[in-house]
Curated annotation (Swiss-Prot):
This enzyme's EC code(s): 2.1.1.228
Known partners and oligomeric status: Homodimer.
GO cellular component, one term: cytosol
Superkingdom in the source lineage: Bacteria
The name this protein goes by in its record: tRNA (guanine-N(1)-)-methyltransferase
The keyword S-adenosyl-L-methionine appears for this protein: yes
Main location: cytoplasm
Catalytic activity: guanosine(37) in tRNA + S-adenosyl-L-methionine = N(1)-methylguanosine(37) in tRNA + S-adenosyl-L-homocysteine + H(+)
Protein family membership: Belongs to the RNA methyltransferase TrmD family.
């Protein structure tokens, strides 16, 4: 099995390639892990890999160009048939059933986010699937990527002496994140939502909240059951549901 990794900290993956069961799998050529660092695709002397989000707010997003070029390079190295996965809190929860599905792929490319995440248009144009290891926040996608690699590697013939099962984690309640956008304003014909460039902070706040509610309703509706929504949240959720069903 071949796995490509896009990460600002490729050295972290020595934990996978040099130690334990996965390290032995790499040594015996049952598993191959290759890494690409977006910093290697920058053009400025500071090797900048972050950029400001449209609409303001705390934190930064990963810069589009270096990340996009790294993904394209990994795709070229993989050839046909590689599935590109973004490790994201907004993704499908990784459980044993999901691991079994992913293990059917001979080639995977794992994109590890940092900062506040990546531009939504990169997800739309470059990513095949989003996966999450749980409803909590980490500083980056590297640990989720290593979790996925470790879990999937167990299904590679010859890696384990016998087939094994893993326990599923429990998850906390909460809303999923809203889409994020950074430069450029237009990417492959897809534009940043005008509200994020309007400068109207209250409208931006409402848009982000509404997007979060809609995503949670569409992707993880069970999370809403344990939340005591405010009057504003209920109103925005009803609007989002009406727009989606119209």
């Amino acid at each position: 099995m071949w796995i490509g990794v896009i990460s600002l900290f490729p050295e972290m993956f020595k934990a996978i390639t040099e130690f334990g069961v996965t390290g032995r799998a790499v040594k015996h050529n049952l598993l191959k892990v290759e890494c690409w660092n977006p910093r290697d695709f920058t053009f400025d002397k500071h090797k900048t890999v972050d950029d400001r989000p449209y609409g303001g707010g705390p934190g930064m997003l990963m810069m589009v160009q270096p990340l996009r070029d790294a993904i394209h390079t990994a795709k070229a190295a993989a050839g046909e048939g590689a599935k590109v996965i973004y490790l994201s809190p907004q993704g499908r929860k990784l459980d044993q059933g999901g691991v079994t599905e992913l293990a059917q792929n001979q080639k995977l490319i794992l994109v590890c986010g940092r900062y506040e995440g990546i531009d939504e248009r990169l997800i739309q144009t470059e990513i095949d699937e989003e996966w999450s290891i749980g409803d909590y926040v980490l500083t980056g996608g590297e640990l989720p990527a290593m979790t996925l690699i470790d879990a999937v590697a167990r299904f590679i013939p010859g890696v384990l002496g016998k087939q094994a099962s893993a326990e599923e984690d429990s998850f906390a309640d909460g809303l999923l994140d809203c889409p994020h956008y950074t430069r450029p304003e237009v990417l492959e014909g897809l534009t940043v939502p005008p509200v994020l460039m309007s400068g109207h902070h209250e409208e931006i706040r409402k848009w982000r909240l509404k997007q979060s509610l809609q995503r949670t309703w569409l992707r993880r509706p069970e999370l809403l059951e344990g939340l005591a929504l405010t009057d504003e949240q209920r109103k925005l959720l009803k609007e989002a549901q009406a727009e989606h069903n119209s």
